[in-house]
Amino acid sequence: MRNPERVSLRPLLGGLILLLALTVIGATRFNSAEQREILDRTGSQLSAYTSTAAAMVTVWTGVQRDAVAEMARYDMLRLLAAEIAETDLPVALLRELGETPWTEQEHGRHSGLDARDRQALRDISPHATLIYRKFVEFISRHDFAGAALLDMTLEPVRLVGQGWQADTRTLLKQRRSKGALSGAGMLPVRLQGERLLVDFYCPVTAPGYVSADDSPQGILLVTCDIGKLLGG
């Protein structure tokens, strides 16, 4: 004979399970709404902080712009930009060698080069290696996040540190279409991971190293971590 108490508990147990399920669903919806609220609030704070930081960075450029412009006038930097502009070296190769000093061993291992390319790299290598060291020193002295030398197509041919993104090239192309790359400038503040970054650019120009229409042969791009800038 079945125990009547056990039978009578089944409906009660089922009701408890249903109640628990409804409670979990309700809590999940509440958490989702709460998360959305947190995200909205965080986004507003980030937007306000970005605006404030951008204003402070604008003031800061008045102090540090001379340092960036001085680096852009570095003779060897102009020479390398001009030499690269005169070659047809593959962009993929320049990117591959962009973050390390160029050496004969690296040139010899690269299978995508013909004799002309190898000769061009041998000619450029001393300048590129020297500029790499100059960039490292420049970044360290001014506490930048990174620096890059871009060629006439706005492709990076010399990269040191962090900060470069493909979107940066798109923004620079938009500036160039408006004729805004003829002088120093600042790109919009952006979020990369948990860091707020801002990019400063300056044309690499000098007599004898520019094209017939006086357009720059290269662009110096410097990335700054706003958190460090503001002492955060």
Regions found by a protein language model. Give the residues of each.
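Extreme N-terminal signal-anchor transmembrane helix of membrane signaling/transducer proteins, especially
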Residues: R2-R36
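Short regulatory/linker helices and ligand/cofactor-binding micro-motifs at input modules
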Residues: R2-R6, T52-A54, R118-R122
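Long, flexible, surface-exposed domains enriched in hydrophobic/aromatic residues
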Residues: L19, E99-W102, R116
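Membrane-proximal amphipathic alpha-helices
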Residues: N31-S47, A53-S111, D123-I124, R141-G146
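Short, conserved clusters of charged catalytic residues that mark active-site
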Residues: T52, V63, L130-R133, C224, ...
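Intrinsically disordered, low-complexity acidic Ser/Thr-rich regulatory segments
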Residues: E106-E137
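Extracytoplasmic/periplasmic ligand-binding sensor regions of membrane-associated signaling proteins
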Residues: A128-T223
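Short beta-strands and strand-coil junctions in structured, solvent-facing domains, enriched
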Residues: A206-P207, G227-G231
